[in-house]
């Protein structure tokens, strides 16, 4: 058992070691691929600089196997006459690059780089003179301005391998990742130059005419025909680069390459990671990649070990198919746009991140009713009847404004608003036609909802008077045709009813009547749409008549039936509200003898209220507010004139309310100094506590108002008065978080320390006190007591004092530095 456990532990350690080794190799491979990407970026910059040359570079010939270092290769005549640096190096011509060719120029590529760093494991690929054309030129890392087309990849020696056809010749080294499923670089022997770098494939855009010959040559080298003449992929790659990029387009491509390097830190690059190794770092270092849309469509077309597709596979067909797809813009924006896989100069048209113009106007109106309906449903229980602009006739929110639009369809109703609701029963015939007047709005949901509202019109038949009284309001509503109806009350939203309450006709009727009540008289309660509010029609008519008479609308001949029954109440209200009507002369001499009243009894029954007897005298009464209420409110708001008038009507300016708050408390909290001074001078009690024991000095201290504290102390405020809740003095109530705390706290602390020391220790009694023990002194309000000893070791709240030749203990919270001010006016 121990051996098995040891063996399992050893296997586990071996697995951990292998996993760590693999992670280390992956990190090294990531660094290697990053260096390769940097070299490729420099290569593309050099290619873009040389793309302005008058002639394309000619591909040199050479077998795939490693040839002698300076062996001449068979070059076709069209390319051999262009004076490529390789031919100049072979023939010893006088070209500027040909004189620098010697064997020592290849030494920097052998084990150490010019910077002293060891070269990568793929160094043998750099030793191929046919795969790297710049070995024959000078060691200057910067290309010459002339003869740019001669050597397209001439560059300074680099210790790190660059992507491209540099690895395409020679046998694979032991470090080639032939078995890595996620590596974008496949086997150099199993695949042609296209398998190594799918981004080097032909562009979906048509090539320029100047490069037709190199394109055909490159195509023949890909297909395997003419491999001896065009086997070196370097020239074919240069031709393809010149075909792919227009002149001076290297800035945008460099930006895209730089942007491609950033996502290399994330594990999932695109959707193609499903088919590749998840954590392969080389997946994310390709300078150009097809987007996820193209990758998913054609991954199985090639039997490549690379996770990306060649650029010449399915690019144009997918782009053409994608143009017809309306949703491709969003997908291309979501995948190809942010990753920047294609240079903007040769992007397909379908990848341009431009939103389509046709789906936009169709989608916007389709989404508008959704938020509006939800808002109406949350705010109003009857949103279904009034959410549309057509304003269906059964809506209780619109105060009879919609009928003029829908009533002209039936011919027997030429005037729908003059005598409004006797004509409402024919509305069910017009209900099926309600969707047709408003076809411009999506009203597909309203016809089934409108099957419920035809019930309320049957309830409205016996009450034409209500609509007669509201005719001017309705006509004014017809002029103002707002798209959305607002609740009549500006102070609240109408309460939302439960779904089952909308089908009850009584509740809909109550909601309609309440919506028609004038705004100043509308109730603010939350239960006004409850079933208990549904009163008989007579009461509602009576209420409407009362309102019309109160607003002096006497031209109400419309109400016909029950008017004699309701007129006594309305006339009594009118007599109290304003001047009497010209018709009734009888109520003017009320003090007349009783024998004159019987002949006028019939008229007085119509003129006088039923709540008052016929012979009762009328007195002119006016409302009189409580002076205490006026005093408290005016002291808080700072109205000195009102305070003075209220004090004249009161016997005690310190009269408190039910909470013990006096006008002096409110004036101090409102920082009204003039009112504070007036109340103190008028004899207000500066020590009047409220229900919590707060005196005016506590209020002033809590506001950090030193000026008011000084005024209160000088007029006999109790310095050591304590609150009932926490027993705190005024000094302890100073607010340290408000302005003026330091001054107020310092002043109150000095006053406390001065009590019994200033004025030869004289303090003044503010209340009467009767001694309970033999060692205590009794005193009355206003008497001066001399403090002999304070802060004794045994008593802290009691001082040893002398009064009238007697000594004893006195409570310190009964005294102040100054005597209390007496009232200076006679009581009313």
Curated annotation (Swiss-Prot):
Q: Where is this region: Disordered?
A: 45-267, 286-371, 393-506, 520-619
Report if keyword Metal-binding is assigned: no
User: Which segments show compositional bias classed as Low complexity?
Assistant: 213-232, 594-604
Q: Where are the ANK repeats?
A: 659-691, 692-724
Q: Please give a single GO biological process term from the UniProt record.
A: post-embryonic development
Q: Does the keyword rRNA processing apply?
A: no
Task: Output compositional bias ranges, type Pro residues.
Answer: 54-67, 401-440, 450-459, 579-593
Location of the protein in the cell: Cytoplasm; Nucleus
**Which PROSITE patterns does the UniProt entry name for this protein?**
ANK_REP_REGION, ANK_REPEAT, SH3
Phosphothreonine: which positions carry it? 123, 308, 341
Chain positions found as Phosphoserine = 84, 100, 102, 110, 113, 119-120, 134, 183, 187, 203, 280, 316, 332, 339, 526, 567, 597
Q: Which InterPro entries match?
A: Ankyrin_rpt (IPR002110), Ankyrin_rpt-contain_sf (IPR036770), iASPP (IPR028320), SH3-like_dom_sf (IPR036028), SH3_domain (IPR001452), SH3_iASPP (IPR042722)
What are the Omega-N-methylarginine sites (modified residues) in this protein? Answer: 137, 142, 144, 160, 167, 180, 205
Query: Family, per the entry?
Result: Belongs to the iASPP family.
- Tell me, how does this one assemble? Interacts with RELA NF-kappa-B subunit and with SP1 via its C-terminus part. Interacts (via SH3 domain and ANK repeats) with p53/TP53; the interaction inhibits pro-apoptotic activity of p53/TP53. Interacts with TP63 and TP73.
Protein known as: RelA-associated inhibitor
